Design a protein with these regions (language model features):
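Rossmann-fold NAD(P)-binding glycine/threonine-rich loop
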Residues: 63, 76-97, 108, 113-117
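Amphipathic, non-transmembrane alpha-helical secondary structure
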Residues: 39-40, 59, 63-67, 111, ...
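Short, acidic/turn-prone active-site loops that include or flank metal/cofactor-
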Residues: 31-35, 76-80, 103
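Rossmann-fold NAD(P) dinucleotide-binding segment
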Residues: 41-42, 48, 55-75, 84-86
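Short hydrophobic/aromatic-enriched beta-strand-loop microsegments
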Residues: 26-28, 69-76, 96-98
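C-terminal substrate-binding/catalytic lobe of Rossmann-fold NAD(P)-dependent oxidoreductases
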Residues: 2, 6, 10-43, 123-239
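Rossmann-fold dehydrogenase core element
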Residues: 71, 86-104, 121, 127, ...
Length: 239
């Protein structure tokens, strides 16, 4: 598989290393200092792109891939205010892309567990819920895309919660996301339901970035044969 990397930070470099080790060819890596080289890539020399760039570059990157007919797996977060525009563009151009706030298989299982627990807790009185995340200090978005996905999974089942807020809150209708940035943490997420008599907690801890990178490569392998706007659920159902 011929992979074009859009963004070449820590995740891009790790994907490069792992993909090459798996026998794939990384045909190029595009970053802020060599963006003019993007024009040399097209669907004849590139099978799929993986985007771990910056929020301000993601939309342009996705549209470029769609224009070139190159499927793109997008792990960049912080650009979702423009997702509806990108979705419309993809449909109009008959393109292919998949956005995921997290490509780790373990985290996506955690997403499902979170939704199931929220459904179980929806009829339980006396419990309040909050979420907590810890990431490395170079993590630019707060809360993380993963935390937002977890919060949305809770909100769809708990009718007494109306929105998430990225702070401690005394408003019973708000779901608190507490964000901490501590090196060298790759990523920890906790969901805590607490009452006067007990507490129920679920937690996911990433020991390294490798799970995210391996997941992105696996998704890219699958996505190159797909068409349209895809989700991680579509990929997981294919396993």
């Amino acid at each position: 598989m011929r992979i074009l990397l859009l963004g070449y930070g820590k995740m891009g470099q790790l994907i490069d290393q792992l993909a090459t080790g798996q026998g794939h060819e990384v045909v190029g890596n595009i970053h802020v200092d060599n963006r003019e080289e993007l024009t040399q890539y097209n669907k004849d020399n590139t099978d799929v792109a993986i985007d771990f760039s910056q929020p301000e570059a993601a939309v342009e990157n996705i549209k470029w891939c769609i224009d070139q007919g190159i499927p793109v797996a997008v792990g960049t977060t912080g650009w979702l205010d423009d997702k509806e525009v990108v979705d419309t563009y993809c449909k109009t151009k008959n393109g292919t892309y998949l956005y995921a706030s997290n490509f780790s298989i373990g985290v996506n299982i955690f997403f499902k567990l979170n939704e199931y627990l929220a459904k179980l807790m929806s009829g339980q009185e006396g419990y309040d819920v909050r979420t907590k995340e810890i990431h490395h200090t170079s993590k630019k978005d707060s809360p993380s895309g993963t935390s937002i996905t977890l919060a949305e999974g809770i909100l769809q089942h708990l009718q007494h919660k109306s929105k998430w807020v990225n702070e401690e809150t005394d408003n019973p209708e708000d779901l608190a996301i507490i964000s901490e940035r501590i090196d060298p943490t790759p990523g920890t997420h906790e969901i805590i339901y607490s009452s006067g008599v007990d507490a129920i907690e679920i937690k996911h801890t990433a020991h390294s970035r490798e799970g995210f990178a391996k997941g992105a490569i696996a998704v890219a392998e699958w996505l190159r044969k797909q068409k349209g706007i895809k989700k991680m659920d579509d990929f997981l159902e294919s396993l």
